[in-house]
Amino acid sequence: MNFDIKTEQLSDSVYAISLAGEVDLYTAPEFKQQLLEVIAQGAANVIVDFSNTTFIDSTTLGVLVGGVKRLRTNDGQLTLVCSDRNITKIFEITGLDRVFSIYGSREEAVAAIDKELPTSA
């Protein structure tokens, strides 16, 4: 099976989940478990990095929608990183490109979140 997942804490409330390979019916449960774990650990903002992902299916979309619902109840957000046109097209066709902010690189996603986070004076 061609799948790998890595989770990284970028700051107190920002986590990144990097997915590689195929995220489908068989691998999405592991992705869902990681996403729920970082939310339980206090993540308010989660970046899901599809940079090394070769395939997603409707199961993946369901995990993302479930995650964004949980995060938004705590004023959080789910941000996506994806530059693969085949994958971004799936978000456009389903209308989910209006639900998620999608960036071409992790740096862009982090910068966008940093701009929205309240600064401590």
Go through the PLM ranges and name each one.
Residues 1-7, 36, 57, 110:
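Short low-complexity stretches enriched in small and charged residues
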Residues 22, 92, 108:
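Acidic-residue sensor for enzyme active/binding pockets
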Residues 2, 55, 68, 103, ...:
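Broad hydrophobic/π-residue packing in well-ordered secondary structure
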Residues 11, 84, 106:
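Short, flexible active-site-adjacent loop segments at beta-strand->alpha-helix junctions, enriched
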Residues 6-8, 81, 103:
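General small-molecule cofactor/ligand-binding pocket signal
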Residues 102-121:
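A charged, well-structured terminal subsegment
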Residues 3-33, 50:
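STAS-typified acidic loop motif
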Residues 25-100:
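Amphipathic alpha-helical interaction surfaces in cytosolic regulatory modules
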